[in-house]
């Protein structure tokens, strides 16, 4: 909805279809990997290989979810993938209880504003009991969002031979369509994507 709301087209598929090669990611400028509240394995070894190959060709990857970092840290292969390929690392488990995210000083000033995500049961979206705190794992990676209650990082971006954006909370749990559209538009600007391009949207 956020991509459509900002005027971009997209194609939706399952993680399995992407990992098994049913969908060819190389024809799309972005993969938006929605992890939600998924637990281990967060990103399977097969999917890791697919994403590694995609990024090696200069791709753009957005990943959001509550457990990408915390559930990857107990497995050496998963942790290496997150640190060396996605360019992020775990700062803290259970990083926020208030459900508020603020932008912070970074080279990407257009990623700005305050965002809120759902922490209580509601009829619209699942509630978030815990989220990951994140840190950059590369000199070319930067923190773009923080949880104001403790200043722990909530989101990072990496810009090198490819680009990644990692959020320690589920993007879809943001409270309002306006918040989702605003943040998505900023992320797509970071990825330098034009509206005529297709977006690969992974659910």
Q: What residue spans do the PLM features occupy?
A:
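Short amphipathic alpha-helical segments and helix-helix/interface helices
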Residues: 1, 48-52, 82, 132, ...
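Aromatic-Pro/Gly-enriched surface loop or interdomain linker
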Residues: 1-30, 34, 72-73, 162, ...
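A glycine-centered loop/beta-turn motif at secondary-structure junctions
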Residues: 5, 56, 60-64, 106, ...
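Structural motif
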Residues: 14-16, 33-38, 64-67, 147, ...
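Alpha-helical scaffolding within the catalytic cores
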Residues: 15-22, 45-49, 149-153
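Generic preference for flexible, low-structure residues
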Residues: 24-26, 44-47, 67, 77, ...
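Residue-level marker of intrinsically disordered, low-complexity segments enriched
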Residues: 28, 32, 80-83, 98-99, ...
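A glycine-rich, often tryptophan-bearing local segment used as a flexible ligand/cofactor-contacting loop or short
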Residues: 37-123, 141, 149
């Amino acid at each position: 909805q956020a991509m459509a709301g900002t005027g971009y087209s997209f194609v939706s598929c399952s993680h399995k279809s992407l990992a098994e090669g049913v969908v060819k990611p190389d024809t799309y400028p972005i993969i938006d990997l929605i992890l939600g509240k998924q637990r281990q394995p967060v990103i399977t070894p097969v999917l890791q290989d697919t994403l590694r190959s995609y990024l090696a060709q200069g791709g753009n990857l957005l990943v959001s979810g509550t457990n990408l970092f915390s559930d990857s840290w107990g497995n050496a292969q998963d942790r290496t993938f997150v640190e060396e390929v996605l360019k992020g690392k775990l700062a803290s488990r259970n990083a926020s209880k208030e459900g508020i995210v603020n932008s912070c000083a970074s080279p990407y000033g257009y990623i700005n504003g305050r965002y809120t995500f759902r922490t209580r049961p509601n009829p619209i979206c699942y509630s978030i009991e815990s989220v990951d705190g994140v840190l950059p794992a590369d000199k070319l990676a930067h923190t773009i969002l923080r949880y104001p209650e403790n200043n722990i990082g909530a989101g990072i971006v990496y810009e090198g031979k490819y680009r990644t954006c990692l959020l320690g909370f589920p993007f879809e749990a943001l409270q309002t369509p306006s918040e989702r559209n605003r943040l998505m538009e900023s992320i797509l600007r970071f990825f330098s994507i034009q509206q005529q391009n297709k977006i690969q949207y992974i659910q």
